[in-house]
C-alpha cells in the first residue's frame, strides 16, 4: 500500500460543495406543458481535504459524481454552492469556477481516454508543449524543445517520439503522452480521472508504476478517481466512497480494505473476485442506483441496503467518526451491522 513520506498541510479543501445541472425541457415545452424547471444534483454537500504528498482515491459506481468532483476542482464546472480552496487560496470567481493563473499552473488533470484527449492533428511535441505556450513560460523554441524532450524521457518515451502523431502510439504510450503534458507546467497536484480504465491489464500496471515513481520523484499529490478497487488498493493513501453525489465513507486505505464500515463499501469489496477462495460470505451489490432526479428520502442507499430500517428511510445520515473512519450510516452508528 502506498504511503506518503509525511502527512503535511491540506493542499486542496472542499467544504460543503454541491453541483446542480439544469436538465429541464426547452422553455417553450415547459410553457405549453406547464412543467417546472428540473435540476439534477450531481454532487451534494461534499467536503474533503487532500493533504500534500498523499493519494486520495474516490470510488463508486458510474454516475455517483466522482468525475464531477474532479471537474469542479480544476474549474471546468463552477460549484452551485460551497467553497473550494487550493493551498488556502479560494477560487477568484467561485460562480464561474475560475482560479488565478498562479493556482492553475499548480494543478493539472489526466483524462480517462487517451484516444480522445489528444489532438490527432498535432505532433506529440505540440501536444506536450501546449501548456508551456499558453503560460508563456519558455519563449525560445530551443528551450521549449528541450523541455518537451525531458518530459517525454521522464515518462518512458524517447525524444524522437515528439515528431510523431498520436495514432502512431499504443493506448499505454498515449497515456504516457497525456501524463507528460500534465507535468509540463510543473504542477504539485494531479487529478487522475480513471487514467487506466481504457488500458489492458498489463499496461495498467506499467502506468500505475510510472505514476508512483513520478509521485516520489516530483513530490506530487494525487486525487485518483476509479471504479477499480484493485487499482485503488495499489495507489491510495486514503479512500473516499461516493454514492449518488455524496461521500458515504472516508478512511485510510488499509483500514477500508481490511474493515469496511458502510454497507455499500462492503458490497463493492465483495464484488471483487476472491482469488484465495476463502469461502467467506459475500453480499453482492443488489438493485440499481436510484434516479438522481428523484432521489429517495433519508439515506439514498436504503432501497438497496439489507440493514435499512425506518430511520434510514426518513433521516439522511451525516458523515461522522466511527472507529477511526468517517461514515454516513445509521446502521453503523446504532451498531446494527
Predicted regions and their residues:
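Short catalytic/signature loops enriched in Gly
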Residues: 1-10, 23-34, 39, 250-337
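P-loop NTP-binding/switch modules centered on Walker-like glycine-rich loops
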Residues: 191, 195, 199, 203-280
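Conserved catalytic motifs of ABC-family nucleotide-binding domains
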Residues: 186
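Conserved ABC transporter NBD signature motif
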Residues: 82-93, 103
Amino acid at each position: 500500500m502506498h504511503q506518503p513520506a509525511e502527512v503535511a498541510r491540506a493542499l486542496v479543501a472542499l467544504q460543503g460543495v454541491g453541483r446542480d445541472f439544469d436538465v429541464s425541457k426547452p422553455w417553450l415545452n415547459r410553457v405549453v406543458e406547464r412543467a417546472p424547471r428540473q435540476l439534477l444534483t450531481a454532487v451534494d454537500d461534499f467536503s474533503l481535504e487532500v493533504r500534500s504528498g498523499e493519494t486520495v482515491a474516490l470510488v463508486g459506481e458510474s454516475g455517483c459524481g466522482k468525475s464531477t468532483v474532479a471537474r469542479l476542482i480544476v474549474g471546468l464546472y463552477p460549484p452551485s454552492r460551497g467553497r473550494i480552496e487550493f493551498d488556502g487560496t479560494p477560487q477568484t470567481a467561485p460562480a464561474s469556477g475560475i482560479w488565478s493563473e498562479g493556482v492553475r499552473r499548480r494543478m493539472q488533470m489526466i483524462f480517462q481516454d487517451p484516444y480522445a484527449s489528444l489532438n490527432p492533428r498535432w505532433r506529440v511535441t505540440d501536444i506536450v508543449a501546449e501548456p508551456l505556450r499558453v503560460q508563456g513560460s519558455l519563449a525560445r523554441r530551443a528551450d521549449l524543445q528541450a523541455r518537451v524532450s525531458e518530459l517525454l524521457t521522464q515518462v518512458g518515451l524517447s525524444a524522437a517520439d515528439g515528431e510523431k502523431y498520436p495514432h502512431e502510439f499504443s493506448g499505454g504510450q498515449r497515456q504516457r503522452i497525456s501524463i507528460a503534458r500534465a507535468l509540463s507546467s510543473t504542477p504539485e497536484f494531479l487529478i487522475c480521472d480513471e487514467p487506466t480504465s481504457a488500458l489492458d491489464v498489463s499496461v495498467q500496471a506499467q502506468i500505475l508504476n510510472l505514476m508512483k515513481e513520478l509521485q516520489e520523484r516530483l513530490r506530487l499529490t494525487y486525487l485518483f478517481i476509479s471504479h477499480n478497487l484493485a487499482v485503488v488498493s495499489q495507489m491510495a493513501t486514503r479512500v473516499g466512497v461516493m454514492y449518488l453525489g455524496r461521500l458515504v465513507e472516508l478512511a485510510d486505505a488499509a483500514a477500508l480494505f481490511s474493515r469496511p464500515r458502510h454497507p455499500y463499501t462492503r458490497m463493492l469489496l465483495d464484488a471483487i473476485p476472491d482469488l484465495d477462495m476463502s469461502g467467506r460470505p459475500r453480499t453482492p451489490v443488489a438493485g440499481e442506483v436510484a434516479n438522481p432526479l428523484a432521489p429517495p428520502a433519508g439515506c439514498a442507499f436504503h432501497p438497496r441496503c439489507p440493514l435499512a430500517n425506518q430511520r434510514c428511510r426518513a433521516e439522511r445520515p451525516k458523515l461522522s467518526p466511527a472507529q477511526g473512519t468517517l461514515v454516513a450510516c445509521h446502521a453503523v452508528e446504532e451498531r446494527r451491522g
